Amino acid sequence: MFFKGKKKDKEKEKSHGNIGNVISVENKTGSQSNLHVEQNLSNEDLKIQFSQLLYELGVPEAKRVEMELWSNDKKWMLLVQNKDKIKENEEKMKQKGSLYETPQFYLSLLRENASIQKTISDLKVSLASNKLSWIDSFIGLSGFDEILKIFQTFQLKPEKNSIDFLILFDCVNIIKSILNSQSGVKSVMTTSHTFKVLVLCLDQSYPPELRNAVLQLTAALTLLPTVGHSYVLEAIENFKVSNREKVRFQTIIEGAKSVSNTQLHYEYLTSFMNLVNSIVNSPADLQVRIGLRSEFTALKLIELISNSKGVSEDLDTQINLFFECMEEDNDEVGAHYKEVNIRSPSEVSTKIDTLLQSHPALHHHFISIIKGLYTLASTQSDLGGSMWNILDESVGLILKDPSKESQLEKLQNENNNLKLQLSEIKLNNSNNNNNNNNSNNNNNDSNVSTPNINTGSPLLPPQQYQDLEQKLQLTQNEKNESQNKVKQLESEIKGLNSTLTGLQLKVTKLEADLLSVSVTTPPSDTNGTTSPPIEAPSSPSLGAPPPPPPPPPAPPVSGGGPPPPPPPPPPSSGGGPPPPPPPPSSGGPPPPPPPPGGMKKPGAPAVPNLPPKKSSVPSVKMVGLQWKKVNNNVIENSIWMNVKDYNLNDQFKQLEELFQVKKPTATTPTAPVGGASNVAVGGGSGSKSIVSTPTISILDPKRSQAIMIMLSRFKISFPDLSKAITNLDESKLNLEDAKSLLKFVPSSEEIELLKEEDPSCFGKPEQFLWELSKINRISEKLECFIFKQKLSTQIEELTPDINALLKGSMETKNNKSFHQILEIVLSLGNFINGGTPRGDIYGFKLDSLSGLLDCRSPSDSKVTLMTWLIQFLENKHPSLLEFHQEFTAIDEAKRVSIQNLRSEVASLKKGLTLLTNEVEKSEGASKTILSGFVGKSTDAVTLIEKQFNTALESFNSTVQFYGEDVKTSSPEEFFQHVSKFKNEFKRTIESIQKERENVQKLAARKKAAASGPSVPSASGSSINIAPKSGVSPITPTSKSSISISQKPPQSTQPSISVQQQQQQHHGDDDDDIPQNGTFMDQLMSKMKGGEAIRASRRASQYVFTQNGAGGVGAIDALNAALKNKK
């Protein structure tokens, strides 16, 4: 369709092979049943239809010519067999319930370029909702290649409209769904082409929504083992060349700044920081991380993000992660220089001075370098500018130059060769002098002239030898001097490496501190003292009581001493800092602003109408529950406003014992070691028009042949066809006929050309177009006919989706049992996160429910908050265990696309408008037909539009009810969160019950084997499937199990394996957890909280241990690290 090559030829050959199979098999089995079908075509029509079939099947040119020589009977048999095959396949597809269920169907539509927007949109939904076997089948049929072709084709369009951008956006989501499959990840990792195509969409000419999706996906791709990071940097370098950037990352930074005044601001910044953290913090090499970080800071990244703290929890997580990793790298650099504090310029200067005293040869070079640095600093107002970045990169290249040692070795070998050559020349020179002396003596003794015979090289004058020797000596001196210079440079590099690295880190740190003081300084309190800025995890303890509410922010303080280094000192009223701001007005303290850095002081109210949350704080450090806070400005209109704090006081002790952080010093978890088309119509020897007189052909040969093939479906004359179109005669035209005719409506240019010629000399295609040109508003008539034929089918297809959306929304909003569970989870999470920035929140987003299964007990990784919750509900609220039975429509609702529904309804309204206009302008039979239909269609379209608006309003109301963002939420995502929790809840219950049954069976076997009398059930030794009321659901004295009875047998301690939960599938819920996992969805979800980047913080943990596994084992190891991350 878009590209031609060997793959397309192979597909044609494959199609040709399939034709051969059809012929060879069905000649034997199917011919008998088809022979009774009478051939009712003329030889010309048979030839045209057979030629059309060969084109549709993609038969190669050479084979096509051969097959066109077949007998008419053989051609007819193949046509009949093909029609039977088509009907059989259609029946099979109808029995399955939909024609849109197979990857082959989507690929055929993509290659035919038929309604590309709707096809891409439907494919996106199918890939997101089907099992991974469906995705693998799509990839196996070269579906990923087709998507990339479409993506690049629309990307290369010089002028793009909103539809083009929408197709690109859907393609990004399709690529993300494909990456959930192992085969999809392999397809992406084979080349950097996918990375380059995606990154090119970060240009500011693309909509922010599309760039945001690309940022999220690219950030996840960066963490792909072995090649992800290098491919992303390669793509960004390609983007730099394409956009003519001075430095890389420049346009990406500018893109983040450009959304500052949009509703997408904080979500876009979160995705942007996700990419920055993935690029900067995942490499294993410290110098690489420092260099990449300096590139971003040189482009004023810190200034960009410092103003955005305290608004979005996800964004705060990414910003804090950036500074945490920077602090870690600073500590690591400091550990490399134990003899000197690399962060102290004075100590570094003293150390350098000592080195200079012991190495006088370095003094001149060092002074020259320092002079240059001083000049650069004094002439540049921007100390984080590009010149410093270039200098830092140059020093890094010198330090990493692998050719330095080889150059020294080469110079040494060359020096040795010169010495050897010099010795040989000296020896030859001495021998030649002796020969000259002997020759002179012989000449003196006799007057006989004897020739001078030299068996070696010709003799040279002594003066020439001396000149050569001097040149060699000079060469050797220059060589020695060069070698000394190399040694001096090497010593200089070693001495200055620590200095330059330390200075770079110092500048970065000072910039961060300066901005933290000047931009994010909190307002002064009522005593006139200023609260210290909170930057990183190294903030002061939160144990002190909170200060009184601060007054409105004062103007930024100017002047004073240098910015304080982190961590900031406590507030002080002593001298040194600038004078405090004016005291607040007497009108009473206004509500305080959000604390900087996302750190929330315990007890501080968030908005004026909300009282402060006072959750209990655990007495020990707990494993945090990763959840997302609902913004306080939407609390009042959501369910969270009426949620009460559930009393879990009697459960605190058990929760602390199960979910407290282990006391031994935690080590960084390491990942386990493991294995890492359209077929062009025309050309060739296609069918030829058989006419008795010379004909005039004014059409393109390909268009002419395509018209001939299309006309083979009509068995009426052109005038009759024209009359059928004019009168909208359904007895002679059907829906497919109208669609075909609409494609060949003559253009105005073609009509003008036809008017200049004699109609009696027209060929068949020209005659056809000439007849169509006589019909007034032929395009409008055909479109009205198509709309009339499709209306009922479209409404039948839309109604189930609209009903599912409406019903799913009402179920989710009105499920009281689900509401009570959310109330319990809120209180549970606030206790677990007590005393941390994640505690004391009013509500959480629904996708946070998946964190219940991820939060494990450090003492026993088999125990999760989900299992604890179910045990607790069994004991206290058993009726809530059946909350999922009230959800009957969400599994259907999560497959609904509002965008598709809106597009289909808009299409119906457009068709209705066209129909109404045509009724006013048409005459005769067509007016009568359309007039009778317009009333019915108006009622039907109005009704379906009303139903859609009702369902949409219900969905938006439900989304708002749970504190979610109406503008960004979609049924695919919103209902997926609820459905996922429902299914995980059911599977966990089934797993617990199965475990109890196993314990019962084991106890029964032991009881039968025992020789003594049986113990009565009243003693409490029997095992109950449901605990009695008042029995604690958790027995904390056992570290290896979850208590499932009042007194379990001492010899067996049952446990619940999370792996078993994830592998067991029941009923219709299998599609929620595909067989091979959801790698990319899980990776992108973990990246939001920083877990994925922390898990891959040192890429060597899961990449360099694979021993050439090609990255597959590395992906498994990364996936395992994400699942086991606590």
Curated annotation (Swiss-Prot):
Residues 1071-1100 form the DAD domain. PROSITE patterns: DAD, FH2, GBD_FH3. Residues 427-447, 598-607, 1009-1022, 1032-1064 have a biased composition (Low complexity). Disruption phenotype: No visible phenotype. ForA and forB double null cells also show no phenotype. Residues 527-611 form the FH1 domain. GO terms for biological process: 'de novo' actin filament nucleation; actin filament polymerization; cortical actin cytoskeleton organization; phagocytosis, engulfment. GO terms for molecular function: actin filament binding; profilin binding; small GTPase binding. Keywords: Actin-binding, Coiled coil. It comes from the Eukaryota. Residues 448-462, 518-532 have a biased composition (Polar residues). One of its GO terms (cellular component) is phagocytic cup base. Residues 612-1011 form the FH2 domain. Residues 38-406 form the GBD/FH3 domain. Residues 543-597 have a biased composition (Pro residues). Residues 463-514, 980-1010 form a coiled coil. InterPro entries: ARM-like, ARM-type_fold, DAD_dom, FH2_Formin, FH2_Formin_sf, FH3_dom, Formin_Homology, GBD/FH3_dom. Residues 1-21, 427-462, 518-619, 1004-1078 are annotated as: Disordered. Interacts (via GBD/FH3 domain) with activated Rho-GTPases. Interacts with pfyA and pfyB. Belongs to the formin homology family. Diaphanous subfamily. Formins play an important role in the nucleation of actin and the formation of linear actin filaments. The DAD domain regulates activation via by an autoinhibitory interaction with the GBD/FH3 domain. This autoinhibition is released upon competitive binding of an activated GTPase. The release of DAD allows the FH2 domain to then nucleate and elongate nonbranched actin filaments. This is Formin-B. It comes from Dictyostelium discoideum.
